[in-house]
């Protein structure tokens, strides 16, 4: 749970842009009993798999990792056609990925997500299955599962 001081600091950013909006969710740990066997992952990594369940009134979002900086307007990215797509993202170069036949990867830290289609086709349920099965074995990271 975020401390009140941190929530206040984040909320104060609203004065930089009148169009910005901050919503804070207290998230239950839906990953109880999940053992992470990779040094470069935390349970927070897996919350992108349930974001559609947390934000039910929004159909499309831009997902950015917390360590991602943006400069400029993201409207053009947000307005990309997502009619039949779950995700749009930036291609990531991964020539030596083990244990997979996936040949095209997207960067899981910067994505446009069609939450409406994802919810309709229950894609997040499938993601959770993959996360629990593969990522818990230390084989796949978030890049593979999203790709």
Which positions does each model-derived feature cover?
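Glycosyltransferase catalytic domains, chiefly GT-A lineage
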Residues: 1-147
């Amino acid at each position: 749970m975020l401390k009140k001081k941190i929530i206040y600091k984040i909320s104060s950013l609203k004065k930089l842009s009148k169009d910005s909006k901050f919503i804070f969710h207290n998230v239950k740990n839906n990953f109880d009993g999940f053992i992470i066997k990779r040094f470069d992952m935390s349970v927070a990594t897996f919350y992108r798999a349930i974001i559609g369940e947390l934000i039910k009134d929004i159909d499309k979002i831009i997902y950015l990792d917390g360590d991602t900086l943006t400069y400029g307007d993201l409207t053009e990215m947000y307005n990309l056609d997502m009619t039949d797509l779950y995700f749009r993202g930036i291609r990531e170069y991964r020539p030596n990925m083990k244990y997979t036949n996936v040949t095209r990867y997207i960067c899981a830290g910067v994505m446009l997500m069609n939450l409406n289609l994802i919810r309709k086709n229950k894609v997040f349920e499938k993601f959770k299955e993959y996360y629990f099965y593969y990522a818990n074995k230390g084989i796949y990271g978030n890049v593979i599962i999203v790709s």
